[in-house]
Amino acid sequence: MNREMLMLVDAISREKNVERDVVFGAVESALAQATKKLHQGDVDIRVAVDRDSGDYETFRRWHVVPDEAGLQLPDQEILLFEAKEEMPDIEVDEYIEETVDSVPIGRIGAMAA
């Protein structure tokens, strides 16, 4: 699939006359939106596409907030004391990420253009 991803990005970049990074960003955003639909709640999803290989990984992430602030968006936030249990060096306004299954590129990449 990674070769297909690169071919797709190159084709869209040439046809639409936009930079490859813009196309990669659109593909990442489309894949993230598709992945969000597979999860319950208003989760925060990030997709990272390797610009050289075309491989991509998908992450669910939580924003670290101060303990005293409480959770305003429970599906997207984690309290600092809970985050430190997983990552002792983490600070407020950083993110904890967990790898989740990636959706297949299929039509999603084409729709991103």
Q: At which residue positions do the language-model features occur?
A:
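Charged, low-complexity terminal tails
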Residues: M1-A112
